Structure formats: structure tokens, C-alpha cells
């Protein structure tokens, strides 16, 4: 079973600073498993849902609201509340809960605890039956072989993309989690690139729309390129936040007494800093991202003879959706924790426009028009031949086409703040045993430092780690050949995430050293396959209808038939092959989906019988105890 909850509103909190609040969620009977939910202090809600596994029956939750969780001087406890929920919870879907002090946790204590505040929590109780991987293996094989289906337009991922009204975001996230660390991500993504190119009507808008390939590549950029993005942009963004210089160049917006020329110079100085940070960063980009961009260029080059289209495809992801989007909204990409004020926000908007303009000019063959005439002078400066040449070289280098002699940097898979525990030190206060550390997990090492800007205080090769464990106090113990490390995580869920991430990279590194590539499934891979199965089973009737239409050989209605069946974007010589392969894909998918659903049904039946037997045994025990009395 899975508990899902999020905060939809909160109020009455006495905040010292405009910081992110943290709601810790645990069960009364298992306080070691703690979930963490971030609450935006400005919007007074959590943007994400917290999902936690839980047992059946009545569930007693303990919700604790904190600010600054790492036990520092600024840590603030705002209160806690107990919530009881079960499968038939009638108090929802949202309800106000009033926070209590620790003394009033069980309803005891005085009434003079002060006004702590309150929060609204929306709780959804959901039961998911996740089966063993061997049940999902046939579906996983179909997904992994999607890049080998000929023609590529008839693969399972092409079918998923064509299903009506499908949210591609969650699907792409599950596919990336399943494939990103295997050797199947590249052929599968390449097949989706082909689909997007064939469906595109105008090469100038290539990969600008919503597609499964675009969603998957963006998911990889934001997941595996997160640290690369932050280290590249943060120095510039922090400087803009700190200095707050006026960069307004629109005459209609310039304040009275302000110098338009000075503002223009300020904007150009910031842009030059941003430009240099971006165009010299290709050596820091994770190699996986470079490989996928290299595949993107190859596929585009195969299907288009126009020069510059390959760079256009790369820039649409790396510049438009990644760097320019992050500059525009640094908080959403976790470059900053605070929202920019109006002046800083305007500066970031103008810089994002300039970066996009330069990128478009470096990949375009002709002149570009502009609706904002007042920006033309700045556009001419930032789109000089030198700027365009450097940008083009960056797009080549980051897609492995330019200088391949670049040194390969490591890929950061996880990073965050933990407390390093050193019990060997003699300290008169327990708190002195704890030191705040910024910890990074790469594909080869575990690195820790005082903060993100400081030099590393220590590093351990993953190959030297012999054992990793997490205790009930959220202490992560890492045993190496020459030392033992301990880090304390803010909660049980985060500690488990670190444990799984370290073990995953250790296993991956061991396979690479032994040269035994295989299926490196991470913990909870079954849940992601089950999400895809649930989607396919939801559209089972749609897939059966498509299969029957194709097998009947009846002429399709041009107005109502789905594009996947009409295949107007497929060349005439391959349409029959597309049809035959699509029928085979649909038949296999329906059979596999039915088999998984049958396993779910049998599991539910066995579970019901087991619960009935337990109920009968419990009832008989009660009768015996009553008769003795």
C-alpha cells in the first residue's frame, strides 16, 4: 500500500526568513521511516506529492513541521500533529490540522503553548500491488527492444506516444529510470527521434513541440545534468541577485532619471559572463548526455540534407529547454532557493532572450526577424560573427562532434547536504560531533566538502567501499578498506535514497570493471514498469480496436483514424512493413498486458483469501478467550 500526501495551504506560522519549510511524515509505529515534503513559504504549499509505503488497516501519521532541518543554530520547530487515516477515510480530500507543541502531542500539557500555526494536508490513500520483476520481464523486453523494431515507427514506444490524451511526462520519467543506466536508452531514443522528424512539417520547429523523445531527453538533462547546470550558471545568477543592477533597455520601461546606455552596458556585461560560462562548460557535461546528443545529430543528419539542422536540434534542447529556461526560472531548476525580485527577474528574462537569439542565429542560414525593435541594437552586439562561431563550436563539442580530445569529467548522480558524524572526537557537546557536509556521488567516487564552493575534504573510490548500511537513526555507515564514514540524513526516506544510490553505482562500477554488462535494475524498477503496464491496460480497448482495424484491411477514414495507423509520414515503400510490424507490436503488447493483469488478479484473490483466514482465526481466538472467562 502507498500513502500519498501533499500540503495545499498553511498559515499562522512565525517565520524568521522566507525559507522552505519541511514537513516530516512518519507512522507512529515505525518512526524510523520518515518522509520529507518541502513546502514553499511564499506559495504556502508543496509542489510535489510525498509517497510512502505503509501497512494495511488504520494508519496513524505523525506530521512534524520544521525549518532548517540540519540541526543548525537556525533550526525552528513549528509544531506537529497526529492524523489517523484508513481505506475509508472520510475527512478528506483536504482538511485543516492545527499544529501542537511536543508537550501536547497526545492531547496533554498546558494550554499556554502559544500560537504555533496550522497547515492543510491533502491525503490520498492508494493501494498498489507491485509484483516481482519476472512478471514484468516480457513487457520490459518489449520496451528495451523498441529500438530494434523495423520500421522504427511501429515500436512499442511509438504506440505509447500515439495513445490519446496521454501525459507524456510521467511516462518519460519511468522510461528514463528504467533505461538510462542500460545500453538500451540510445537505440530507443533514436527510434523516437526518427518518429519526431518524420512527423515534423517545418524543420525550423524541429523538437519544439510535445513529444516523447523531447520529454525523455529533457528528463535526462534535468536528472543527470542537474549538477552540471548548477555549477555552470550559479556564479552568474548569484552575482545578478547580489548586485541587482538595472538592465532595462526598453525605453518605455526605463525609469525617469535612469541612463539607458548604462543599463545596456550592465546587460551586456552580464550576458558576456553568461555566454562564457555556457560555451566553456562542455567538458563538465555528463558523458551520457553527450552520447544522446551525438545520436540526435546523427539521426537528424540522416533525414535532412540542410546544413545547420543538426545544430538546431541540439540547441533546441541544450539552449532553449535547458540553459535559457534555467536562467529564466533559477528556483525551478534549484539554482537558487529564493524567487527573484522584479528587477532581477527582468534581467534574467532579457538574458534568456539574448541567449536564445544567439543560439538561433548560430544555427540559422538567413536573418531573423524581431518583434521587439528596442532590442535590435543589443541583438546586433551579442550575435556577432565571433559569438556565433563560439556558440556553434559549443554545440559541436557538447554533442561529441567538435574537439574529442576534451578530458572526460565524472557524472554526478546525487548530491545534497548531510551531517558528517565523527564520534572519535572528544567534544563537550554532542552537537560538535556533527559537521555539515556537501556530499556528491559520482560514477566513480563519493566526495564530501564543507559546501559547494569549497575544495573536497575527502573522497572515496566506489571500488573501495565494502559495505553500506542505514540504522534506525538515519545514520549512513560506509565501510571502506582503510576507513569508516558516517553521515546522518535528515530523514529515513532520504537515508534510504542515499543507500540505494550508492549501492546502484557500486554495482554498476563493478560490472564495468569486470566487463560483464547486464541488466542493472535499481530498487523499485518494478514500480516503474507497473506504471507503464497500468497505462497500457487503461488503453487496452484502444489497442484492440487499432489491431482489428489494421487486420481487417478496411480503408481507414482520413479524418478520424489515428496518425499511427494512417502512417502518412512513412514513405510509400515502407507502409506495408509498418502495418505488419505495428500489428505484431499491438498483439504482443496486448498479450503481455493481459498476462500481467491476470497475475494482479490472482494476487488479489490470494490476498482476500488470506485476509479471510486471518479474520476467522482471530474470531476463533476471541471466542476461546471469552469461554475461558
UniProtKB/Swiss-Prot annotation:
GO molecular function, one term: GTPase activator activity
One GO CC annotation: cytoplasm
InterPro entries given in the database record: PH-like_dom_sf (IPR011993), PH_domain (IPR001849), Ras_GTPase (IPR039360), RasGAP_CS (IPR023152), RasGAP_dom (IPR001936), Rho_GTPase_activation_prot (IPR008936)
PH domain residues: 411-507
Domain Ras-GAP: 183-398
Domain of life: Eukaryota
Biological role: GTPase-activating protein, which inhibits the vulval induction by acting as a negative regulator for the member of the Ras family let-60. Probably decreases the signaling activity of Ras by stimulating its intrinsic GTPase activity, thereby lowering the levels of GTP-bound, active Ras.
Subcellular location: Cytoplasm
This protein's record includes keyword Endoplasmic reticulum: no
PANTHER family (alphabetical): GTPASE-ACTIVATING PROTEIN, RAS GTPASE-ACTIVATING PROTEINS
Protein name: Ras GTPase-activating protein gap-1
TM stretches of this protein: none
GO terms (BP aspect): associative learning; chemosensory behavior; long-term memory; negative regulation of Ras protein signal transduction; short-term memory
Keywords: Cytoplasm, GTPase activation
Main location: cytoplasm
Residue ranges of coiled coil: none
Entry-linked PROSITE patterns: PH_DOMAIN (PS50003), RAS_GTPASE_ACTIV_1 (PS00509), RAS_GTPASE_ACTIV_2 (PS50018)
Annotated site (Arginine finger): 208
Amino acid at each position: 500500500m502507498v500513502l500519498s500526501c501533499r500540503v495545499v495551504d498553511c498559515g499562522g506560522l512565525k517565520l524568521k526568513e522566507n525559507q522552505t519549510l519541511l514537513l516530516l511524515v512518519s507512522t507512529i509505529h515505525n518512526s524510523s521511516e520518515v518522509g520529507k515534503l518541502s513546502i514553499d513559504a511564499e506559495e504556502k504549499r508543496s509542489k510535489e506529492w510525498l509517497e510512502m509505503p505503509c501497512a494495511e488497516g488504520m494508519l496513524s501519521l505523525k506530521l512534524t513541521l520544521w525549518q532548517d532541518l540540519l540541526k543548525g543554530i537556525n533550526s525552528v520547530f513549528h509544531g506537529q500533529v497526529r492524523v489517523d487515516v484508513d481505506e475509508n477515510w472520510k475527512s478528506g480530500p483536504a482538511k485543516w490540522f492545527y499544529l501542537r507543541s511536543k508537550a501536547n502531542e497526545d492531547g496533554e500539557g498546558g494550554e499556554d503553548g502559544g500560537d504555533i500555526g496550522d497547515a492543510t494536508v491533502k491525503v490520498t490513500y492508494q493501494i498498489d500491488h507491485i509484483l516481482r520483476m519476472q512478471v514484468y520481464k516480457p513487457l520490459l523486453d518489449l520496451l528495451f527492444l523498441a529500438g530494434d523494431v523495423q520500421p522504427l515507427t511501429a515500436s512499442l514506444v511509438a504506440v505509447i506516444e500515439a495513445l490519446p490524451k496521454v501525459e507524456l511526462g510521467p511516462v518519460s520519467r519511468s522510461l528514463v529510470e528504467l533505461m538510462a543506466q542500460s545500453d538500451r536508452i540510445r537505440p530507443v531514443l533514436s527510434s523516437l527521434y526518427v518518429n519526431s522528424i518524420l512527423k515534423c512539417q517545418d524543420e525550423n520547429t524541429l523538437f519544439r513541440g510535445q513529444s516523447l523523445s523531447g520529454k525523455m531527453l529533457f528528463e535526462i538533462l534535468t536528472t543527470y545534468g542537474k549538477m552540471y547546470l548548477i555549477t555552470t550558471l550559479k556564479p552568474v545568477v548569484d552575482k545578478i541577485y547580489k548586485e541587482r543592477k538595472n538592465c532595462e533597455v526598453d525605453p518605455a520601461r526605463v525609469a525617469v532619471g535612469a541612463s539607458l546606455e548604462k543599463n545596456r552596458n550592465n546587460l551586456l556585461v552580464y550576458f558576456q559572463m553568461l555566454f562564457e560560462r555556457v560555451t566553456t562548460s562542455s567538458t563538465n557535461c555528463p558523458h551520457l548526455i553527450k552520447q544522446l546528443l551525438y545520436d540526435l545529430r546523427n539521426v537528424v543528419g540522416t533525414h535532412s540534407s540542410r546544413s545547420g539542422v543538426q545544430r538546431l536540434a541540439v540547441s533546441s534542447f541544450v539552449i532553449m529547454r535547458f540553459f535559457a529556461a534555467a536562467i529564466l526560472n533559477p528556483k525551478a531548476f534549484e539554482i537558487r532557493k529564493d524567487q527573484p525580485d522584479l528587477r532581477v527577474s527582468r534581467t534574467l528574462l532579457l538574458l534568456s532572450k539574448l541567449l536564445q537569439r544567439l543560439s538561433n542565429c548560430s544555427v540559422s542560414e538567413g536573418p531573423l526577424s524581431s518583434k521587439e525593435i528596442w532590442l535590435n541594437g543589443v541583438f546586433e552586439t551579442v550575435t556577432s560573427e565571433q559569438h556565433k562561431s563560439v556558440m556553434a563550436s559549443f554545440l559541436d563539442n557538447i554533442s561529441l562532434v567538435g574537439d574529442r580530445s576534451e578530458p572526460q569529467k565524472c557524472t554526478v548522480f546525487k548530491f545534497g547536504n548531510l551531517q558528517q558524524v565523527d564520534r572519535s572526537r572528544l567534544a563537550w557537546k554532542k552537537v560538535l560531533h556533527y559537521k555539515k557536509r556537501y556530499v556528491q556521488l559520482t560514477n566513480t567516487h563519493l566526495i564530501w566538502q564543507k559546501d559547494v564552493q569549497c575544495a573536497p575534504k575527502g573522497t572515496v573510490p566506489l571500488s573501495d567501499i565494502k559495505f553500506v548500511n542505514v540504522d534506525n537513526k538515519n545514520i549512513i555507515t560506509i565501510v571502506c578498506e582503510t576507513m569508516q564514514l558516517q553521515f546522518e540524513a535528515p530523514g529515513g526516506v532520504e537515508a534510504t535514497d542515499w543507500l540505494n544510490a550508492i549501492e546502484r553505482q557500486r554495482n554498476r562500477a563493478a560490472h564495468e570493471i569486470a566487463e560483464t554488462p547486464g541488466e542493472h535494475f535499481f530498487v523499485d524498477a518494478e514500480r516503474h514498469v507497473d506504471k507503464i503496464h497500468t497505462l497500457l491496460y487503461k488503453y487496452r480497448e484502444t489497442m484492440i480496436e487499432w489491431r482489428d482495424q489494421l487486420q481487417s484491411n478496411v480503408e481507414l477514414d482520413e479524418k478520424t483514424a489515428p496518425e499511427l495507423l494512417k502512417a502518412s509520414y512513412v514513405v510509400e515503400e515502407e507502409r506495408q512493413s509498418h502495418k505488419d510490424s505495428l500489428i505484431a507490436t499491438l498483439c504482443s503488447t496486448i498479450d503481455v498486458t493481459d498476462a500481467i493483469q491476470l497475475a494482479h488478479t490472482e494476487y488479489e484473490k490470494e490476498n482476500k483469501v488470506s485476509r479471510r483466514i486471518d479474520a476467522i482465526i482471530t474470531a476463533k481466538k476471541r471466542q476461546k478467550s471469552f469461554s475461558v472467562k
